[in-house]
Amino acid sequence: MGLVALLLIFLFAAMFVAVSVVSLGAQVFFPEAFNGVAAGLATLIKEIIYSPTIALVGLMLILPLAAFVFLRSKLIPRWKPWIMLALLLFLSLSVSGINVVISYIGNFFTTSLAEKDPATFWRFMWVYAGVFIIASPIVVVYSYTRDKLALYWREWMTDSFLDRYFQNRAYYEVNSQKEIDNPDQRIAEDIKSFTSTSLDFLLLMLGAVIDVISFTGILWSISTSLSIGLIIYAVFGTVVMVILGKRLIVLNFNQLRKEADFRYGLVHIRDNAESIAFYRGEAQESVQVKHRFLEAVRNFNLLIGWQRNLEYFTRSYKYATYIIPSLFLASIYFAGEIRYGDIIQAEFAFRQVLEAFSLVVYKIESLSAFAAGINRLATFNEFLRDEKNAVELEVRTIDTVIGSQLMLEHVTLDTPKHQKTLIRDLSVAVQPGEGVLIVGQSGAGKSSLLRAIAGLWDSGTGRLVRPELGEMLFLPQRPYMILGSLRSQLLYPNSSSEVDEEKLHHVLASVNLADLPERLGGFEADLDWAEILSLGEQQRLAFARLLLTKPRYAILDEATSALDLDNEQHLYEQLQATKTTFVSVGHRVSLVKYHQQVLELLGDGSWRLVSTEEYRCSAKVFG
């Protein structure tokens, strides 16, 4: 914001220089027209030039330039947005200047009509035509530059949020934050609204300041009492709208959340359509999604009710502005102290200054929606600022150490926030090239232990030694199918790797998916893979990723649950041939033979670690 302020200071000074040059030039070459529009402007400019004030103007030009030169190394990478911001602010000043000129032209134009003075009428008609020719492209370029700068800002801000969203697995941790709902909407929609609306309000505020400075002088020169009445009227309207607008901010915030919840319900149905169809759960799904919609409708009814009440006030407030200037000026006009054109100019200036003073009144609905969006972005930004904010500070955490093998030493694993202890005092080492199978009843903590190994959970005590996560590959029960080509699916998460098609064909054949490229359009086919492939095909594709990636360690969470025994055996034999060390979670007895050790979680926090031979002989498991 400091650089923006310096830029504004520089532009104000530059605008003064430009106005001075144009005004003094116009007085020399077009004295009659210039003196008719702004007789005292050239005199005022000369007084400033020959006074100490000119030194201040010089400083306003030199100091911002020096600051920008000093910071040029930081600004060069983003020079386009800064150039566009400077152009936009300059155009904003120009538009305000044009409005001032038009107010004077309107004064003389209407006075000439009232006094039946054709010479003055046609002279200012030509002046207005010239201003129109100049103003039209300025206004068009102003609108284009504003939208373009908002787009640049959105691009930068979205990149920043996305970078932090994917750092330290914040996208995973955000699910535990109840106050941060629908992060997708905050990134996709709230940032877009924030950037465009913020820029609009910045320009509105700048225009308001310029209008107050410019038109208050005009208004004061015509009627002091009207100027004072204007200030009182504007303050009254602003106070009333601030009081009434507080409720509107809350309703807008709730509306954003409820609309996002409704949309999420529809997306959830789309993503789980097959499961819903199998369960014949249409009636229940319809009830829940309609409930979300009715919540949005109920809140919107409250919102439009408050908007209606505000509209009563804002309409009355606005309509009164058409009569107030005439009430103040009628007596002095009838007394012959001002011309008819002065009334027209005063009305124009009155509305310009009133709009500047009454931004809260006229923009209360936009401001309330904007405030709600800022609140949502602020909480999300606070969460992303530091990954430690993603979860509450833990009293006890598992100490994770990067080492050459996978080993747990006296690990006690709790659920997040320490609500429940899942495993107590676990010690196990996975020998290189071997496999460990984790078994146990549902809820015993099998998948939770994998989350701890992956660094997703750290609630508890003890010491976890593991390789870098880049040396490990996790295969969940339902593999993640990315949005991309078949090649990208196979190479994920290293989609930029260069692998020839012959090798890709070979790997697919090794997991019994040799026909996949020909059947679905080749390796560059971009399809909805989660919908097209069965769960069994997805699991085999995940094994193909493993064979291509060749990690030192593989963590498999029921990664073959949808496969028949022959395919399961084939894939585990392929895995064993790579000499990859692996940890599996599963329920099938058939998995035991592919591992050297079995870790059984007994469900009460206790556990036992046995060889596969001992586990096979266990009467507890096999009855």
Please provide the spans of the model-predicted regions.
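Transmembrane-helix motif of ABC transporter permease domains
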Residues: 1-10, 47-68, 75-98, 115-155, ...
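Primarily ABC-family ATPase nucleotide-binding module
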Residues: 38, 42, 179-180, 381-437, ...
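A hydrophobic transmembrane-helix motif
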Residues: 90, 134, 138-139, 203-245, ...
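Juxtamembrane loop-to-helix connectors within ABC transporter transmembrane domains
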Residues: 168-212, 271
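Loop segments that connect adjacent transmembrane helices in multi-pass transporters
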Residues: 251-304
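Cytosolic ends of transmembrane helices, especially the final helix of ABC transmembrane type-1 domains
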Residues: 258-262, 277-281, 287, 324-325, ...
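ABC ATPase nucleotide-binding domain helical subdomain, centered on the C-loop/LSGGQ "ABC signature"
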Residues: 471, 487-528, 572-573
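ABC-family ATPase nucleotide-binding domain "signature/switch" substructure
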Residues: 489, 523-623
